[in-house]
Amino acid sequence: VPLFGEYNEKGERIKKGLIIFLENKDNPTSVRNWLMAYAKTNGEFIYKTSIKDGVTFNRLIGYKPFNPDKFVIIITDHLRKLLPERGFKMKETVDKFSEYAVEFRNVCKFTFVHIIHLNRSISDISRRQFDDDKLFPQSDDIKETGNYIFTMFNPNDDKFNLKKHFGTILRTPQGALIYPNLRTIHLVESRHCFCPQHFRVNMIGETKKFTEVIIKK
């Protein structure tokens, strides 16, 4: 099944793809409501009934998907663009969505991929230029709820003025890029494996692919 679905000559979709796009911005609670409806359509919640002092309680204890082989991955691109929740500030809004994500992860086993775009200020860039090849992404605000925290960095960006990165020479003596599609991916936090870990890849944006970087001797 195509990821984006199938379309006829008029551009009309004739078959749904694997990806469901939510184009309109929304707040965390509205997204949670959509996910709740999706979960109910594709499975059933399991409750345990108990009675105390004559009052009946239904406690949520699990979720059973109709298709146990189906993986549900929710990608938020990007997290800071969520609409404010009840007048919350940005951090409070992000924290609320993270809280909801943990609920669905723990109960429904949904996987959440939160994307955050970071823009360094000019003053910060100038300060970090002196680090040269020691420059690599770090986060001082790692979410305790994340299983894995990855960062991606473009060492070829002119504003960083790097000559080498993690021991890899980036430019020829004439200033030409040796690895024009180079990106470095960094596993900075993990609950399930050793970290940090660092990886070099070629990012081919046109085809949305990553390939291994072969270091030139």
Please report, for each region that a protein language model flagged, where it lies by residue.
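Walker A/P-loop NTP-binding active-site region of P-loop NTPases
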Residues: 1, 78-81, 145-147
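Cytosolic-facing regulatory segments adjacent to core modules
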Residues: 1-68
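Loop/turn-to-beta-strand initiation segments
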Residues: 16-19, 69-73, 108-114
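Flexible beta-alpha connector loops of hexameric P-loop NTPases
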Residues: 19-21, 83-95, 125-132
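Short acidic, S/G/P-rich loop/turn micro-motifs used as interaction or catalytic elements
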Residues: 26-29, 80-87, 120-122, 158
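Well-ordered, non-membrane alpha-helical segments in soluble/globular domains
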Residues: 30-38, 90-103, 135
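Helical hairpin unit composed of two closely spaced alpha helices linked by a short loop
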Residues: 67-68, 72-98
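Phosphate-binding/switch region of NTP-binding enzymes
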Residues: 102-216
